[in-house]
Design a protein with these regions (language model features):
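Basic- and hydrophobic-enriched, low-structure N-terminal and domain-boundary segments
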Residues: 1-211, 215, 220, 547-548, ...
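Hydrophobic alpha-helical segments involved in membrane association or supramolecular assembly
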Residues: 75-83, 441, 445, 516, ...
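Ordered hydrophobic segments in well-structured contexts
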Residues: 176-178, 425, 575-579, 592-594
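Intrinsic-disorder/low-complexity loop/linker signature
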Residues: 187, 191, 550-551, 601, ...
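Conserved ATP-driven motor cores of ASCE-family P-loop NTPases powering translocation/secretion/packaging/pilus
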Residues: 478-480, 484-581
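P-loop NTPase motor domains
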Residues: 25, 42, 149-153, 194-486, ...
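Glycine-centered small-residue hotspots that permit tight backbone geometry or close packing
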Residues: 132-134, 467, 574
Length: 668
């Protein structure tokens, strides 16, 4: 009740001020249009004397503007205390329009009194313009009281609530990767840093094609880690994009290494620009389980659907058979023929020759007992099916160029050997992905085993477009390599792609064990998963209720997604969200980021123009200078086949000469 009385009293005061304002405006008209007033007969003697006294003592009418200014002041005060009904469509444009028009009519009409017309004409025009101006000013003032002070629709995408302070301090250590950023906070763009102070906790870079993964992040990983003396293994899906960056950056930063590193390339497309390396080098295989790992990697890369069927009979059988062949080649004459091409050629011999040879060795007899039972039991169809499961996919890999690269021994795969550090790039080709990925997967699996050891040089494994290759043991590498100073950086498009090619279980392990996450634009379940990973933050909510007589505003807070899935689904190229991990002695308070990664495009373009192509490694020339590439690799191809034929013939002959096993050789 008291509040209503107060409002009623306030209303009376405002009405009084408005009335005084109107009286002052009338006094202005009465004084400056006095002759017309006299003609109209509205002059009053008492009023005349009062106005003359006001003018004599206060100079009220010394200027035509004085009374107008006082009138406007009182009008403004009356409007200020008026509580109007809020209107959502009321805008400042409308208000400013009527205020400007009203001010012009109210203040700038003095010249009308000087027009060379009758006094009545002057007075009529003056009164009309002043009245119209006053009404416009009154409307503008009242509309201001009806204007909504807070437009809830100014931030329709909730950018202000979802922007947050990010890391602005540069944190550098001997392993860190540091990316400059620009982020939006409190209605302005700020400079910041993404500090990956512990790359050994693994990093993954997600984003749809064209989101800027390689340009903004992967390229920077390669450059900065070379600058800090990392040994590197780079899987270059679109060879030579990453390879040229690594090669040229290494040329300019050899001084970052205590021992000068060597640059090696595996490239099946062009043997001239490829080193040769045997991924199943017998020197690095100590147990038959190593042979099994190699066979497992090859077969699952050739048959991606088998990843979901691990443990099935027709999946394990060809893997075990290939593993036995690899181990046989390892123990035969101290690994003289222990290469993958030799294993393929051996597998393609008739099974009547394969099994007697393999079972001649005690350490393989038990390993192959299921095959021997099927053979001796007359289950020829089953046996042929098992062998065909291995032969058919491996036959796709029979290629002179591939045989050439995989039978040489230019270098070993222990890339982080402190005495012989290496930067190794392996190139794939999207057009031959299914064939090359299997061979390159073999290099991957061997490297994982060799680099994940104590007392080695700090190293980095960078895999671009991870789902295009099956990386056996990747989940274990991420989980255990931190203490061995192995940094892993994985690039792929989204989690569904990873799940499709690696299976649900392995995909989940990779997702949940990676410590540093970068994501460009991704959609669907991937965006939702990332949004949940980034967590929630306390956000302010404001609601407004407008009725005929009043407006009420309520402000509340609630926990909501810091970076919602909808934002992640619509990120601009070059803008990334993510989170980084820190160290005990290098705490990062704000690990989450949502920022544009700043890349000096002019500098990068200049660097790329100055890049040298990867040089020719092997010159395939005859004495007369003519090219003999085809002849050389074909000769190597025939040599591999002939070596296996010779091996098989000698072993069969030896078995025939062994009475205990001669029964395994069927009589012709």
């Amino acid at each position: 009740m008291a509040q209503e009385d107060d409002l009623r009293a306030l209303g009376k005061i405002m009405d009084f001020l408005r009335a005084v304002s109107i009286i002052l405006a009338i006094m202005n008209v009465y004084w400056y249009c006095y002759e017309a007033m006299h003609i109209w007969g509205v002059t009053i003697g008492v009023v005349d004397r009062i106005l003359i006294n006001f003018n004599r003592t206060g100079g009220l009418f010394h200027s035509i503007l004085y009374t107008k200014l006082f009138s406007l002041l009182l009008l403004a005060l009356s409007c200020l205390g008026t509580k109007g009904v809020k209107a959502e469509k009321m805008s400042w444009n409308r208000i400013w329009t009527v205020l400007v028009v009203g001010s012009c009519l109210f203040f700038l009409n003095w010249w009308i009194l000087l027009l060379p017309i009758s006094n009545l004409g002057n007075a009529t025009l003056y009164i009309f313009t002043m009245t119209a101006g006053y009404i416009c000013l009154l409307m503008g003032g009242l509309w201001m009281s009806r204007l909504l002070k807070h437009n809830l629709m100014e931030d329709v995408f909730n950018n202000e609530n979802e922007s947050f302070m990010q890391e602005t301090k540069l944190m550098v250590n001997e392993y860190s990767v540091n990316l400059p950023t620009r982020f939006y906070y409190k209605k302005k763009w700020n400079k910041g840093w993404i500090n990956v102070v512990n790359p050994f906790r693994a990093s993954m870079v997600l984003g749809t094609p064209g989101s800027g993964k390689s340009y903004a992040i992967v390229n920077n990983y390669i450059k900065q880690q070379i600058e800090k003396g990392f040994a590197m293994y780079i899987y270059d899906y679109k060879f030579p994009d990453l390879s040229e960056i690594a090669y040229n950056h290494l040329l300019h930063h050899l001084d970052a290494y205590k021992v000068k590193p060597q640059f090696y390339v595996i490239n099946f497309d062009d043997p001239r620009k490829s080193h040769r390396c045997n991924p199943i080098n017998p020197a690095f295989m100590t147990d038959i389980s190593d042979a099994y790992e190699s066979a497992y990697t090859i077969m699952l890369n050739l048959n991606r659907s088998w990843i979901q069927k691990q443990g099935d009979f027709f999946v394990e059988s060809p893997i075990i058979l290939l593993a036995a062949i690899i181990w046989f080649l390892k123990i035969y004459e101290k690994g003289k023929y222990c290469t993958f091409p030799h294993a393929i050629e051996f597998l393609n011999r008739p099974y009547a020759q394969i099994f007697p040879i393999l079972t001649f060795y005690d350490e393989l007899a038990n390993y192959l007992s299921p095959f021997m039972d099927a053979w001796e039991g007359g289950a020829q169809d089953q046996l042929q099916g098992q062998i065909a499961s291995a032969k058919i996919p491996l036959s796709r890999m029979i290629s002179p160029a591939l045989y050439w690269v995989m039978t040489g021994d230019d270098f070993s795969l222990d890339i982080n050997n402190p005495k012989e550090p290496k930067v190794l790039v392996v190139g794939n080709n999207p057009d031959r992905q299914n064939i090359y990925s299997a061979a390159l997967g073999l290099y991957n699996s061997r490297i994982v085993k060799l680099i994940n050891k104590k007392k080695q040089l700090k190293s980095s494994v960078i895999i671009d477009e991870l789902p295009t290759i099956y990386f056996r043991g990747l989940d274990n590498l991420i989980a255990t390599a931190r203490s061995n100073k192995v940094a892993v950086c994985l690039g792929f498009q989204d989690f569904s792609q990873l799940t499709r090619d690696y299976g649900d279980k392995e995909s989940k392990v990779i997702q949940n064990t990676v410590g540093n996450v970068f994501s460009g634009q991704v959609v669907g379940e991937t965006a939702k998963t990332l949004s949940e990973r980034f967590g929630k933050v306390l956000q302010q909510r404001q609601s407004m209720t407008i009725n005929r007589n009043d407006k009420s505003t309520s402000i509340s807070t609630q926990m909501d997604s810091l970076i919602p899935a909808s934002k992640i689904s619509n990120l601009t190229q070059g803008i990334f969200v993510g989170a980084v991990s820190d160290n005990f002695d290098e705490r990062i308070d704000q690990k989450i980021f949502h920022a544009e990664i700043v890349v000096d495009s002019v500098k990068v373009s200049a660097e790329m123009k100055a890049y040298q192509p990867i040089p020719v490694i092997v010159e395939f020339k005859n004495e007369d200078g003519s090219d003999n590439l085809k002849e050389t690799i074909e000769a190597n191809y025939r040599k591999v086949k002939q070596e296996i034929l010779t091996l098989v013939d000698s072993e069969i002959q030896r078995i025939k000469n062994t009475p205990a096993l001669s029964h395994l050789i069927p009589d012709k």
